UniProtKB/Swiss-Prot annotation:
Originating species: Synechococcus elongatus (strain ATCC 33912 / PCC 7942 / FACHB-805)
UniProt cross-references to InterPro entries, sorted A to Z: Aa-tRNA-synt_II, aa-tRNA-synth_II, aa-tRNA-synth_II/BPL/LPL, Lys-tRNA-ligase_II, Lys-tRNA-ligase_II_bac/euk, Lys-tRNA-ligase_II_N, Lys-tRNA-synth_II_C, NA-bd_OB-fold
Domain of life: Bacteria
PROSITE patterns: AA_TRNA_LIGASE_II
CDD domains: LysRS_core (cd00775), LysRS_N (cd04322)
Alphabetized PANTHER family for the sequence: LYSINE--TRNA LIGASE, CHLOROPLASTIC_MITOCHONDRIAL, LYSYL-TRNA SYNTHETASE
Binding, Mg(2+) 1: 407, 414
Protein name per its UniProtKB record: Lysine--tRNA ligase
Quaternary context: Homodimer.
Location in or out of the cell: Cytoplasm
Residues that hold Mg(2+) 2 according to the record: 414
GO molecular-function term, one example from the UniProt record: ATP binding
Length: 504
């Protein structure tokens, strides 16, 4: 590799000696590759159009013969062939470079970025091409592209060198184009419904809005520990208190947690809050939002995912957590009187009981995660959660011990989370103080009491429905991607081992 780099570096020096800058400033393009392919799709073989076009892109393949060369040029839109003829270049570039064809053969490589001008022709073999009259090497690449990138078994190398992955894999570029369309469609749908997006702080004095371990940083001037936000919830609720009735924020969230095919410490979510609404309203919003985005981006409500077809046509299935656990395990949590009876029933069903399980609510959730979650392939709203695992949700209006909360599961993954939001400041204080006690007892995912948030609630927050959607997981679904790292352009990875460490 170092020899190849040295050879290419020498070519860059030769270009400078010839008076050509190998790292150009600009190039005027008249068309993209895709535009030319569409515009001249009906051009017959052997014909040429006497209209000058200009294009730029990366050389992806080159075949050089005696007095003729064929390059494949790739820009963001696609590829097109370059037809490079010695005599034609010698005549058209005589004033610029009398040895234009020789220098083209000797000083260009696959991976270089080239600008060309010429006319469009279709070869006798039927390949649409640009018959080049003038070219310029716009960027001399020093690193060769991998010959068999598709066959690499080291998947992490694709993530580490995403720029190369994007160059050689058009389907990867399409994933990120689709991601951009998804986020744009989400924003458009919410704005059409009267919501506005307001940005909230990334650096926060108190971590809150979720149970998660935060990243901690330090502000030198204020001499203050700060947290990277683990949710946008508490600040968006302050906006509801302040008089905004429909707000959302789509942005980055940071949680100091593990890495897996479903989790990245830095991820994207959207949180939506609507005054005078409840979790039933949020279910309807979630259905219509995701269905509309799928139709706009995928073109269908029947979405293929890893060999399965996911039907996103509303209405989606609704079931309580207790109903789903009963169906999967035979355990009727609604009839259990105390934790001791619950543990006995769970053990009798052959489900391992975690050591730290202080109440029936957490035991129910444990059974759900063990036996139900992975089976929820088609869109399912799991509703009515235990109060013990939902510190920010309003008590259920007719079911003691439960809260008005749902989570949306698709392909066995949580995709959205929603509450009828807790607006009682006294109840909220009790729950946050219980969470703070958990933190003091060693729970790294629990948080301290956010006194300013409680003060905001004491000024009066209207009935509110809240919703959070994991954007990365939604993009995974709508791009048929098995790993979250496939839909994050630059995912966090473990440091690469040095050559000495690898040998050891």
């Amino acid at each position: 590799m170092s020899d190849l780099r040295a050879t290419r570096l020498e070519k860059a020096l030769q270009l400078r000696e010839l008076g050509f800058e190998p790292y150009a400033y600009r190039w005027d393009c008249s068309h993209s590759a895709a535009q030319l392919q569409a515009l001249y799709a009906d051009l017959p073989a052997g014909e040429e159009v006497a209209v000058e076009v200009a294009i730029a892109g990366r050389i992806m393949a080159r075949r050089v013969f005696g007095k003729l060369a064929f390059f494949t040029l790739q820009d963001e839109s696609g590829q097109i062939q370059l037809y490079l003829e010695k005599q034609r270049l010698s005549e058209s570039m005589a004033a610029i470079d009398a040895e234009a064809f020789s220098h083209l053969k000797a000083l260009t490589d696959v991976g270089d970025i080239l600008g060309v001008k010429g006319s469009v022709r279709r070869t006798e073999k039927g390949e649409l091409s640009i018959a080049v009259d003038q070219y310029a090497i716009l960027t001399k690449s020093l690193q060769p592209l991998p010959d068999k990138w598709h066959g690499l078994t080291d998947v992490e190398k694709r993530y580490r060198q995403r720029y190369v992955d994007l160059i050689v894999n058009p389907e990867v570029r399409e994933t990120f184009r689709r991601r951009a369309k998804i986020t744009a469609a989400i924003r458009r749908h919410l704005e059409d419904q009267g919501f506005i997006e307001i940005e909230t702080p990334v650096l926060q004095a108190e971590a809150g809005g979720a149970e998660a371990r935060p990243f901690i940083t330090y502000h030198n001037t204020l001499e203050l520990d700060l947290y990277l936000r683990i949710a946008t919830e508490l600040h968006l609720k302050r906006l509801i208190v302040g008089g905004f009735e429909k707000v959302f924020e789509l942005g980055r969230i940071f949680r100091n947690e593990g890495i897996s095919t479903r989790h990245n410490p830095e991820f994207t979510s959207i949180e939506v809050y609507q005054a005078y609404a409840d979790y039933e309203d949020m279910m309807r919003l979630t259905e219509t939002l995701i269905a509309q985005v799928a139709e706009q981006v995928v073109g269908s409500l029947q979405v293929p995912y890893q060999g399965q077809t996911i039907d996103l046509a509303p209405p989606w299935k609704r079931a309580t957590m207790a109903e789903l656990v009963l169906a999967a395990t035979g355990i009727d949590f609604e009839s259990l009187k105390d934790l001791e009876a619950g543990i006995a029933a769970v053990k009798a069903a052959g489900i391992p009981v975690p050591e730290d399980c202080p109440n029936l609510g957490k035991l129910l959730n444990h059974c759900f995660e063990e036996k139900v979650e992975a089976t929820l392939i088609q869109p399912t709203f799991v509703i009515d959660y235990p109060v013990e695992i939902s510190p920010l949700a309003k008590p259920h209006r007719s079911k003691p011990g439960l809260v008005e909360r749902f989570e949306l599961f698709i392909v066995g993954r949580e995709t959205a989370n929603s509450f009828s939001e807790l607006t009682d400041p006294v109840d909220q204080r009790q729950r946050l103080e219980a969470q703070a006690a958990d933190k003091a007892a060693g729970n790294v995912e629990a948080n301290d009491v956010d006194e300013d948030f409680l003060l905001a609630l004491e000024h009066g927050m209207p009935p509110t429905g809240g919703l959070g959607i994991g954007i990365d997981r939604l993009v995974m679904l709508l791009t048929d991607s098995p790993s979250i790292r496939d839909v994050i352009a630059f995912p966090l990875l473990r440091p690469e081992a040095s050559s000495e460490e690898a040998e050891a």
